[in-house]
Swiss-Prot record:
HAMAP family for the chain: Ribosome_mat_RimM
Entry note about domains: The PRC barrel domain binds ribosomal protein uS19.
Protein name: Ribosome maturation factor RimM
UniProt-annotated location(s): Cytoplasm
Known partners and oligomeric status: Binds ribosomal protein uS19.
Signal peptide, first to last residue: none
GO biological process, one term: rRNA processing
Length: 176
């Protein structure tokens, strides 16, 4: 797999379930079931990504468990516990023009309407009402900021997102 084809991590494999190699699944998708919309999966085992197919999955109480191709014993499943689950970027669904994957916003420069470079998006936090960009300020920030928290509210604070140019234009006071 080439370096520009780094998998997008959608979850991880949890503990074993039963003696036939089933594993609990932790999904980072909006809904737990969403992770099963993608096939094949890539599993990062011993630092290497490899392809794997989900044979079947089901709810087991509040947990979700899955049977993976080639994993038929509890011992083999234990070897996969805590391995990341990923997919290739081209497997991701296309989004409407005004929606973005978080991974595309990470690393974008944040510039306000006065042209002030406020820093780079380091993380995004889901708060319930709206997502919040955690912007790591530049080393020599004129306002002495280390980090800024900007609500991701398009049309109000977020004026333009240029994913290709890795830049976000905001209406935000750099001293706030």
């Amino acid at each position: 797999m080439s370096s520009n084809q780094q998998p997008v991590v959608l979850g991880k494999l949890g503990s074993c379930h039963g003696i036939k190699g089933w594993l609990k699944i932790t999904a980072y998708t909006d809904s737990v079931e969403g992770i099963f919309d993608y096939s094949p999966w890539l599993i990062k085992e011993n630092g290497e990504w490899r392809e794997v197919k989900v044979i079947q999955w089901r709810y087991q109480g509040k947990a979700v468990v899955a049977e993976l191709e080639g994993v038929t014993t509890r011992e083999r499943a234990q070897m996969l516990t805590n391995c990341e689950i990923g997919i290739l970027p081209e497997q991701m669904n296309d989004l409407p023009e005004d929606e973005f994957y978080w991974r595309d916003l990470i690393g974008c420069e944040v510039i306000n309407t006065n042209g002030y470079n406020m820093g780079v998006v380091d993380q995004i936090v889901e708060t319930g009402s709206n997502d919040v960009l955690l912007v790591k300020a530049n080393a020599k920030d004129s306002f002495g900021k280390v980090e800024r928290m900007l609500p991701f509210v398009p049309g109000q604070f977020i004026l333009k997102v240029d994913v290709q140019g890795k830049q976000i234009l905001v209406d935000w006071d750099p001293d706030f």
